[in-house]
Amino acid sequence: MAGGNERSIKALKEVWRRAENSFCADCGKPDPDWASSTLGVFICLSCSGIHRNIPSISKVKSLKMDHWDDAQVQFLANHGNAVTKATYEAHIPIYYYQPNYSDCQVLREQWIRAKYERKEFTELGKQLPYHDGVKEGILWKRGRDNGQFLPRKFLLSEREGCLKYFTKQDAKEPKINIKIDVINATFQPVKIGNPNGLQITYLKDNKTRNIFVYHESGK
Ligand SMILES: [Zn+2]
């Protein structure tokens, strides 16, 4: 704690030691040693890297190496993981998958941005476009040519009765848009090499097409 005075170091340790702050606010990893001085959350090193990508929302500092002044320590004391969670995670849809520390960076970044940057869960109904029987999530899809798995946004719409997926995170038009009633999905852990592997088969132009996907959690 270079340069810090003893009183603020002591106060910082007291806040840090609270049970609510002993797990990363974003992925649940034990013993976080970073914190956001603007959001007031205690986070792990890995999630602090994601926070650093959204500097307009979050300023991260090491709890061990950086100096925290009295006002910043007071801010952490007034916020902390429990209070901040009550605000930013107030209304998470039941189908929303909350990543943990074993999940990949892509999933965690999506979660962190949804939570703090887009504030999707602060108010009831903010997720309205998705509420209408629509499930959205990231699945790892095998590329047709090189066989490599890449994360892709998938959308399942009950109202429209179709499954769509997008090659780009912010794409407006889906790469495919298939009617659910022509889809056949089977679990194929061996074929795909993942316990949560799924083969989606559908008909297009009278030809059978296959998509191979998996999700890390199996949800
Ligand atoms: Zn974390």
Question: Model-derived features: where do they sit?
Answer:
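Polybasic phosphoinositide-binding surfaces of eukaryotic membrane-targeting domains
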Residues: V134-V182, P195-L198, I211
